[in-house]
Design a protein with these regions (language model features):
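Secretory/export targeting leaders with adjacent low-complexity proregions
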Residues: 88, 93-351
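Residue-level signal for mature regions of secreted extracellular proteins and peptides
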Residues: 13, 36-38, 64, 134
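C-terminal soluble interaction/assembly domains
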Residues: 21-25, 113, 353-456
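N-terminal low-complexity, Pro/Thr/Ser-rich intrinsically disordered segments
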Residues: 38-49, 54-105
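Bacterial Sec signal peptide processing site at the extreme N-terminus
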Residues: 14, 18-37
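Secreted/extracellular small peptides and ectodomain modules produced from precursors
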Residues: 18, 41-43, 69, 126, ...
Length: 456
């Protein structure tokens, strides 16, 4: 990917600050012997769950109805250059409210939920591979490595609890309006069927990142615009929008030659772009991990919402499975429907034999132990305690997890997307996950806010 750090005299700020600037999905990748540099998470405005189409993962793959999540598009404004004074401030975790350990129901070995503490330990050790060298995390991660060494990487729930209380303080996340409850959704890693050769059986390509796709990282110009970027291509000396879905999915695509795998089902390709990563089962039995590489910069538009607005589906049946069923019964209308979403995601093949996809932290995410958050409000890599309910249920789900991923629709202090793992069962849970919940964040006692105030 080409990255430009020069100042364009006319950057459309309204575009850069739109709700969906990246792909509508979670970009996850697989683990290498040496951990890769963390990449930006997918932007998935459908990702009501971790990023679903019409309604994020809620559409993801379940028959469970979802409430459509709208990507808010900016109102037309005059073009202007944002100066550092005008630019929005980066959050400094000021919405985190200190609480006592005993105030958090379920985060104690005596609560009947103690086993969950030790089960979260492998995910925490993954976080430490990325955080351990950072000053504010170094002491806690060093102690974690020592505890793992002493217990053969299997500390008891009591040992984990004692460790957490010794090295961490706990904070309740809140929203801007002061409320402490928010939406908890889910995402997963799908399984597709494909081939390295195009054929009548496998006609739909996955594309590598195009050579002419340019990304402008706005924080190189304005630190206040961290996580903001624009994408496009050069025509002469002018940066113009990159090709949209309708322009790419034609008989002679402008990015021809970047195909690397072909899939048997166009619907599966579309939803793979929403999830951001997946497993492709090849004809010879080989399984290939594919992960998010980049996105064309076009705004994500939920096709589920389009179907609801047209009266083709109701909110009650606009789940991911409901959308798939509609698509298979209306193949003559499918291409036009998909083109309503101009966003397009490019992939890359990941190393074989890896334990799972990589999240935005740059470490492998683990099923039911990793969660996507908004890094403006929750430090990436931190342990978080999630209190919500099981998908489509009132059964409590209280679990220590790790904030190891992000998502374009995961915005706000009390907002999370739970990674359920890979395959059909995980997809069913992810698609049904649209629950209310609360979140607590565990931060090292040395952790310092942007305001230079030590959290105690």
């Amino acid at each position: 990917m080409k990255k430009i750090s020069i100042l364009f005299s006319a950057i459309l700020v309204s575009a850069t600050l739109s709700g969906c600037e990246m792909a509508n999905l979670r970009k996850t990748e697989v683990v290498k012997p040496e951990l890769p540099v963390a990449t930006d998470a997918k932007c998935d405005c459908s990702h009501v769950t971790g990023a679903t189409d019409a309604i994020k993962l809620t559409e993801k793959n379940t028959d469970t109805p979802l409430v459509p999540v709208q990507c808010i598009e900016p109102k037309p404004t005059e073009t202007k250059i944002i100066t550092p004074k005008e630019a929005p401030k980066i959050a400094d975790y000021g919405l985190l409210k200190p609480v006592r350990w005993e105030d958090v129901d379920g985060l104690d070995v005596d609560s009947g939920n103690g086993a969950q503490l030790s089960l979260a330990w492998p995910a925490w050790m993954q976080s430490c591979t990325a955080l351990g060298a950072r000053p504010m995390w170094q002491k806690a991660c060093s102690a974690a490595n020592q505890l793992s060494s002493e217990t053969n990487s299997k500390p008891s729930a009591e040992a984990v609890q004692a460790y957490l209380k010794q090295y961490f303080s706990i904070y309740k996340t809140t929203n801007v309006d002061g409320s402490d409850s928010g939406l908890i959704t889910g995402y997963y890693e799908p399984l597709l069927k494909g081939s390295r050769t195009k054929s009548a059986k496998y006609p739909y390509p996955l594309y590598l990142q195009p050579n002419d796709l340019i990304t402008v990282e706005l924080d190189s110009l304005f630190p206040e615009l961290k996580y903001k970027r624009v994408r496009g291509r050069l025509v002469g000396n002018k940066l113009v929008p990159y090709y949209n879905r309708a322009e790419i999915e034609v008989d002679s695509p402008p990015i021809k030659g970047r195909e690397f795998i072909y899939i048997d089902d166009i619907i599966d390709v579309f939803f793979l772009q929403i999830q951001g990563s997946g497993l492709v089962q090849l004809e010879n039995g080989e399984q290939v991990h594919v992960g998010y590489a980049d996105q064309n910069g076009q705004t994500y538009n939920s096709i589920g919402r389009v179907l609801i607005e047209r009266g083709e589906l109701t909110v009650a049946n606009a789940s991911m499975q409901g959308i798939k069923n509609w698509a298979r019964n209306n193949m003559n209308k499918l291409r036009e429907l998909l083109n309503n979403n101009p966003s397009y995601v490019f992939f890359r093949e990941l190393p074989a034999g890896l334990p799972g996809p990589l999240g935005a932290l740059g470490v492998p995410i683990l099923g039911e132990r990793s969660v996507a958050v908004d890094p403006k409000f929750v430090p990436l890599g931190a342990p978080v305690f999630l209190s919500t309910t099981e998908p489509n249920s009132n059964k409590p789900l209280k679990r220590l997890m790790m904030a190891q991923d992000t998502g374009g629709a995961i915005k706000g202090g009390v907002r999370a997307d739970l990674f359920w793992g890979a395959g059909f069962e995980a997809g069913a849970k992810a698609g049904a996950m649209k629950q209310a919940g609360k979140i607590w964040v565990l931060l090292p006692k040395e952790f310092v806010m942007n305001s230079n105030q030590v959290l105690r």
